[in-house]
Amino acid sequence: MGDRGYLVLPDMLTSQQKIGVLTTKRKDEEIRHYLDINEIGFDLLKKQAGQQVTAILDWDLRYHQMRIHSAVHLIHCILEQVTGHSIPYPVRSPLNDESGENHYQLLDYIDKDILEKATTELNEFCSSGHEIQTVNVPEQGNNFRIWKCGRWSIPCGGTHVKDTKEIGMIFSTLKIKKNMTRIALRLSDNSG
């Protein structure tokens, strides 16, 4: 899930009209903005080609994504701690407006009781406040970064909060189907 927000074009500055950015995606080393425009808006954009624009980020969405992204890494790490197993990285970790998930190949040693225990430990860990870092590792290649919190580290190039207190209360659910273990996390509305 990419960022959302608005673009304000030079001719629009006085009238405060905005063009919605529905999402952003990286493709071929470019950041592409997918816009909410009609034919009139498209004609206006063509006239403004090459002009500088002002981008307004939907910060509430971005901050939620940073919180949930950090939480899905932490639940993985704490599940390893609770189960005593090294857990393969998720095959997917999709984020959306409401939640974040880790999708694993079937993990038969994780059940609702284990997830409940891990979620309790996760909430205790987060509320006690721990620094979260993202560290560039240039010897691994361009743009290679590692997420770090406490003794844990995971390869990740995404955005994260700086402290676990910012995440807030976490709620979890477990679904097992079609040889997949899916752990979904939701956050309370309040952080820190």
Residue spans for each PLM region:
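Active-/binding-site microenvironments in catalytic and ligand-binding cores
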Residues: 1-192
